[in-house]
Amino acid sequence: FAPELIDSVMEEIVGMEQPYRYRNKAQFPVGRDREGRTVTGFYAGRTHTIIPNRNCLLGMPMNEKILETVLSFMEKYRIEPYDEKTNRGVVRHVLTRYGHTTKEWMVCLVINRTKLPYADALVEELVKLEGMTSISININQKNTNVILGEKVETLWGSLYITDYIHLRTGADWQVEGDGIAYRISPQSFYQVNPIQTEKLYSTALAYAGLTGEESVWDLYCGIGTISLFLAQRAKQVYGVEIVPQAIADAKENAKLNGITNAEFFVGKAEDICGRAARIIK
């Protein structure tokens, strides 16, 4: 397209005033450096070499304290980091999640075993951190690049943290209403930038121009974040997702908010839509 055409139809990008310290989720690989020390951080580009880093400026400052706690625990009890070349070792990743509005914290260790040795000692230290709500392990014993396995076991607290997404209106993005609450597990898909998510969803809702008479389909709905947000203005919302646990979470999120005009289906979008449409008729 010609640049002048693009300029004529493109609206101004809605940016962030402070584009730092916003990520509500982080996943840190655990391994050894060249000197054999246990480290965590991020992979160098196109490699599986970990660059030690405990304090990414996009993440929350609390991540550093969590990682220090985990690494100190591993050193004290001689818990081995995972070695992907040999498929040996225990701790593969440290996953953290944060509720932007609730200030709740989740820590989940991805491990190469069915049990974490000395787990009680780790819990004893992590619960000292402000806002700690959920401590769990995720079991992944496969030789794979996929971070999370299928099974999660709670070590302390709840399996979930809770967060809210608020409707924002006007040029200054004023909050309207109490927001929609969401339960978030280690495996849940949830937008990582809570500030921009509210702007994005509110803009989508405004563009939809819902009057309260429409039926809306949300394909690949995950835990129902967009579905339940749109349910505030739609007559009926239908969500479709292939992951059963995500749909279970979506239904629980609807109950959590007292939303009765949202229905969720498990299956492929291409299979569900036609069949569900006939049923709804």
Model segments located where?
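Rossmann-like S-adenosyl-L-methionine
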Residues: 118-120, 124-281
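SAM-dependent transferase fold signal centered on methyltransferase-like domains
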Residues: 1-162, 167-180, 202, 206-213
